[in-house]
Amino acid sequence: MDDDQQFCLRWNNHQSTLISVFDTLLENETLVDCTLAAEGKFLKAHKVVLSACSPYFATLLQEQYDKHPIFILKDVKYQELRAMMDYMYRGEVNISQDQLAALLKAAESLQIKGLSDNRTGGGVAPKPESSGHHRGGKLSGAYTLEQTKRARLATGGAMDTSGDVSGSREGSSSPSRRRRKVRRRSMENDAHDNSNSSVLQAAASNQSILQQTGAGLAVSALVTTQLSSGPAAGTSSQASSTQQQQPLTSTNVTKKTESAKLTSSTAAPASGASASAAVQQAHLHQQQAQTTSDAINTENVQAQSQGGAQGVQGDDEDIDEGSAVGGPNSATGPNPASASASAVHAGVVVKQLASVVDKSSSNHKHKIKDNSVSSVGSEMVIEPKAEYDDDAHDENVEDLTLDEEDMTMEELDQTAGTSQGGEGSSQTYATWQHDRSQDELGLMAQDAQQRDPQASKQDKGEQTEGAQDEFELDDCLLESNDIVITQNKDGFVLHVKKLGNITAAKLEENQAVAQQQGQAAVTVTGPAGQPTPTITELLNAAAASHSEPKPTLTTLTSTPIKLPSSECELINIKKIIPATTTIATHHPHTSSTIIHPHHIIQHVSQEPHHQEHHQQHQTIHIEEVPQTSQQHHQQQHHHQLQTVQPTHTQVQSIITAHPGQTINLVGLRNVQLADSKPIASRIRYSRGKIIGPTVQNLQIVETHEPIQHQHHELSDGTKYEISEIDLNNPNASAAIISDLVKYAEIDDIELPDGTKIGIGFAPSEITEHMQTSGGETHITTIEHEPQELQTVHQHEQTQQTHHIHAGQLQTHHIQTVVQSSSGQQQHDQQQHHQHHSIELQDDDGVETITPEELGMHDSSKSYTILTTRPMKEESEHDPSGMTYELSLSDSSLGPCDDPESRYVCRHCGKKYRWKSTLRRHENVECGGKEPCHPCPYCSYKAKQRGNLGVHVRKHHPEKPQLESKRGRKV
């Protein structure tokens, strides 16, 4: 008796263990003996798994006697192949609805069990014999699409159990909790799942009852559309808006093959289905943009296309209790609450594309059953991978296997979510990012259009009554003969008195240009954007203003202009030869080069920079010439150098002129002629920018004599008329600000806490630069083609090329110093001439930066003027003074903004809140103290060693930092 007794040793976890072993072997590429190739990419696999999961592979591998054959799948995409591999090895895969039809078609061609017909006798799909499936013998062959409620809506910790369903595996819509945990452990480091969120992981051969709940909630394409209750019974369209609850209808049990082929064509014949189908279809199209899903069954896709209801399984428990276990009497699905909850849960964004629907319908045969559209042992539900719940947390799982043929840019926007990496992630996510930035660009343009002109008008309206000399001298920070800088609650105010006689006509002209700027500054189009009629009209108006009052000023071109980015300001320099010279109106091709950072084609519809070489009066008549030849109208010493890589980090943009010349600086922002090439990329300035047009007649007289301190008398007739200052544009700001400080004798501006405002340009650097140029007329302009830089530079001795590195932002952070009351200015040339580059954090994101958001190198306390716009607009007939508001970029101006800042420096007039701070300022910084801390990497000198450390950190981040006296780096 005892000898005949036998014990049955049952390995309860045999299947899951075996599956995890194969999965691990695949991850480590251990014992792989065949290779599958698609689209030039390779996936290694095991013959035994392929043979077990596909009769096609089994037959193919039996005929191969190679040790390691390579199968090249011609019509299968790599993402589809990868999804099928995951499906075969793990029994389930997550796939987007857009890719579902293509995947099923490929799986059908490869005869993957559970994903294709694979009909054997009686329409029963063969069971997977190998470890490629979770529920080997228990479940029958149709694939299931499981859907789980994303517990992240309620609690983040519930994600682990979101896909887990307790209970027996028979009749359950999802694997048991124990088996799911095993699979999760085995796949924690799975490269396929972690790198590809669109891997189809529907528990394949273990599928059971496909129940189509009528939850036609199109918002959540989590269509576990239970085809319960044959469509004749109403197809249970449980749209979220209608929230109609389908009654429990007896679903006739059909063959599982038919469950695998259930389409909404089942719903078509039934008269009762038509009404609910129409409702579902309406909701489908209405909420199409918001459809988020973890995965979608092909049948569900077809169902939704032909009016079938999209079901939202809010919970696995809902699926089990309400629909799955019931068999023929399955419930119609989750209640509307769970449906709506699922609708908004974070999942793969899937668009209900009719094309995809049609494709899926055409790729699969439809079984039309009047009242019986449910299958016996297989339930088609979509189950999100628990790994994604664990890993993605609050972020959406992004479908990275978007069928590019079916996807448009808008759809890519909709499907964009958290990228899980993988093969398709780079293209899809990059495209979405690109479009998103385009949208943000447009929104910013609209916001700017609403904000800037209104702000300018408000400022003008409020300040028009004020007279020229009514400056707030109580808060005066700096005062010279011609420029007074005061401070208000918003920032610093620059009051500029007229230098020289300027006619009211020119004032009107500048106002017209200002209006144009105010509009152009906030009008943004994309790289291929079309110009707006507003700009064209303003250009025409500006042209009329140019031509009417002054015959020497030619009309602006009326061709449309494109503004690639609202962040990019520029300075256009227009030189006008005095009275006897007439400059012809320019053809659109004739556009002057302008100063501007890289990648923006800057063709400004202004007169080009005409150079006069050793001659005080030279009449230049410019006919219509093509753009490429416009440099020939400049001096021969202008060498056009096309550079891509920088060889010199210094950009010199000091503009000097001989006597008798008038240079009008008219700011046009990002002007590009209509016939120019499209913009290659956008630039986001990572630092502050000028927002409003500063249009009024600010004139600065310049001579080319290398005198240490230039005065603002009209010694040589050279005049500058500045319409807009761009401090983010290194070339423009260098030229304009240097002239501002040089010729108006502005004492350097310094904040109360000893920090500097980047505005001052010392005369020494300008004269030194002029000496290097031999006293010639020297204009450095840079015209940017999409991928190259053209540096036009005139130099007497050598061809000195100054580049702006493409991909870097040249920004001025001028560490100004406060001198004695004599008004002498000491500053180093390098600080002003060398524009230290700052890497762009995000090269193609464009965003409007406000002073509150912008911390301008907080450690260095170096401020860049963000906004200059006229506060006081003087009378048109009295263009003798102008007031500019200089808003600074850092919010740490608090001490200066505080009304209690009552301690004033006797040397520079700065106010300090604390007397100790004023004392430190006077002892260390002010009172004629000379800079004594030279920078080891440039010619900059600082008054304090701490400022030198700030300078090195800011402008030489790649160089070794200074060692502090305390033994730590500053």
Swiss-Prot record:
By stage 11, isoform F is expressed throughout the mesoderm whereas isoform T, and at low levels isoform I, is expressed throughout the ectoderm. Isoform K is expressed in both mesoderm and ectoderm. Expression becomes restricted during later stages; starting from stage 14 to 15, isoform F is expressed in the gut. Isoform I is expressed in the CNS. Isoform I and isoform F show expression in the epithelium starting at stage 14, though for isoform I the CNS expression remains predominant. Keywords: Developmental protein, Differentiation, DNA-binding, Metal-binding, Neurogenesis, Nucleus, Repeat, Transcription, Transcription regulation, Zinc, Zinc-finger. Residues 447-456, 808-818 have a biased composition (Polar residues). SUPFAM superfamilies: beta-beta-alpha zinc fingers, POZ domain. GO terms for biological process: axon guidance; axon midline choice point recognition; axonogenesis; dendrite morphogenesis; gonad development; larval lymph gland hemopoiesis; larval somatic muscle development; nurse cell apoptotic process. GO terms for cellular component: cytoplasm; nucleoplasm; nucleus. Residues 32-97 form the BTB domain. The keyword Membrane does not apply. One of its GO terms (molecular function) is zinc ion binding. It is found in: Nucleus. Residues 115-200, 228-340, 447-468, 790-843 are annotated as: Disordered. Residues 162-175, 228-251, 263-293, 329-340, 819-828 have a biased composition (Low complexity). A zinc finger (C2H2-type) spans 903-925, 933-955. Putative transcription factor required for axon growth and guidance in the central and peripheral nervous systems. Repels CNS axons away from the midline by promoting the expression of the midline repellent sli and its receptor robo. This is Longitudinals lacking protein, isoforms F/I/K/T. It comes from Drosophila melanogaster.
